[in-house]
Amino acid sequence: MIKQRTLKQSIKVTGVGLHSGEKVTLTLRPAMPNTGVVYYRTDLNPAVAFPADPNSVRDTMLCTALINEQGVRISTVEHLNAALAGLGIDNIIIEVDAPEIPIMDGSASPFIYLLLDAGIEEQNAAKKFIRIKQYVRVEDGDKWAEFKPYNGFRLDFTIDFDHPAIGKDVRNYEMNFSAQAFVHQISRARTFGFMKDIEYLQSQGLVLGGSLDNAIVLDDYRILNEDGLRFKDELVRHKMLDAIGDLYMAGYNIIGDFKAYKSGHGLNNKLLRAVLANQEAWEFVTFEDKAQVPQGYVAPVQVLI
């Protein structure tokens, strides 16, 4: 049987909030089988829970934010969510003493190290996957995202920015998902932004924690980071990282073929909602026999960094 996974022990880290610029403490805790991914804001009394749910994503302007019925929000969940998807963690309690998850270095890599440091253990319950059964597509102007049936999790993402530093050869990335592929090819790709947008946002009291330490920053001509890029196509890889985090907002790893053009948090969420709203388009599956599992999900609990 392919089993659900949680952490072996709790672990804590501090970082900076991207929007507030304030110190944020993040605590990750093990959870019982079938708990799912649950975010908690512990700075509120009583603490407010945000179970990962695509219908709770009500703001995708600059990040993915979960907002409850009372208007309480928790922001910038997508990079941590991507790390959970990457390692196939089904059950976890995430506590944060602020309205946002710390930005760390702008990628999912620090969260991967944190999760592996806590240790991953299997639980005595079958892991559920969402298997795509029908073609589903959503569009927004010239942007689109789609799912097709496929026995694995394949991703194909294309960006299109009219910028001299983003050539045609670095606008597309394709990958067959596995924990190993995610850790090595995707998790280190950092978020990016354009100087003119950042200056405006900071004048509005946003992205106050944004810096060259936690983002790739571009002016009108070039990349401003002294050390350059981690991959020549780091920008499109980061967009794929975002998509993996956004699509894990259902709390289950997906078996299907995902393809997107210029998609962002909003369209990724719209696609996930469209799939789940159509009961003919998907099904829950579990695997009693490891031989039946799609190749990318036959992942060992130990991932080599």
Curated annotation (Swiss-Prot):
<dbReference type="Pfam" id="PF03331">
    <property type="entry name" value="LpxC"/>
</dbReference>
<dbReference type="GO" id="GO:0103117">
    <property type="term" value="F:UDP-3-O-acyl-N-acetylglucosamine deacetylase activity"/>
</dbReference>
<keyword id="KW-0443">Lipid metabolism</keyword>
<feature type="binding site">
    <location>
        <position position="79"/>
    </location>
    <ligand>
        <name>Zn(2+)</name>
    </ligand>
</feature>
<keyword id="KW-0479">Metal-binding</keyword>
<feature type="binding site">
    <location>
        <position position="242"/>
    </location>
    <ligand>
        <name>Zn(2+)</name>
    </ligand>
</feature>
<dbReference type="GO" id="GO:0009245">
    <property type="term" value="P:lipid A biosynthetic process"/>
</dbReference>
<feature type="binding site">
    <location>
        <position position="238"/>
    </location>
    <ligand>
        <name>Zn(2+)</name>
    </ligand>
</feature>
<dbReference type="GO" id="GO:0046872">
    <property type="term" value="F:metal ion binding"/>
</dbReference>
<dbReference type="InterPro" id="IPR015870">
    <property type="entry name" value="UDP-acyl_N-AcGlcN_deAcase_N"/>
</dbReference>
<protein>
    <recommendedName>
        <fullName>UDP-3-O-acyl-N-acetylglucosamine deacetylase</fullName>
        <ecNumber>3.5.1.108</ecNumber>
    </recommendedName>
</protein>
<dbReference type="GO" id="GO:0016020">
    <property type="term" value="C:membrane"/>
</dbReference>
<keyword id="KW-0862">Zinc</keyword>
<feature type="active site" description="Proton donor">
    <location>
        <position position="265"/>
    </location>
</feature>
<dbReference type="InterPro" id="IPR011334">
    <property type="entry name" value="UDP-acyl_GlcNac_deAcase_C"/>
</dbReference>
<dbReference type="InterPro" id="IPR020568">
    <property type="entry name" value="Ribosomal_Su5_D2-typ_SF"/>
</dbReference>
<keyword id="KW-0378">Hydrolase</keyword>
<comment type="pathway">
    <text>Glycolipid biosynthesis; lipid IV(A) biosynthesis; lipid IV(A) from (3R)-3-hydroxytetradecanoyl-[acyl-carrier-protein] and UDP-N-acetyl-alpha-D-glucosamine: step 2/6.</text>
</comment>
<dbReference type="InterPro" id="IPR004463">
    <property type="entry name" value="UDP-acyl_GlcNac_deAcase"/>
</dbReference>
<keyword id="KW-0441">Lipid A biosynthesis</keyword>
<comment type="function">
    <text>Catalyzes the hydrolysis of UDP-3-O-myristoyl-N-acetylglucosamine to form UDP-3-O-myristoylglucosamine and acetate, the committed step in lipid A biosynthesis.</text>
</comment>
<comment type="similarity">
    <text>Belongs to the LpxC family.</text>
</comment>
<keyword id="KW-0444">Lipid biosynthesis</keyword>
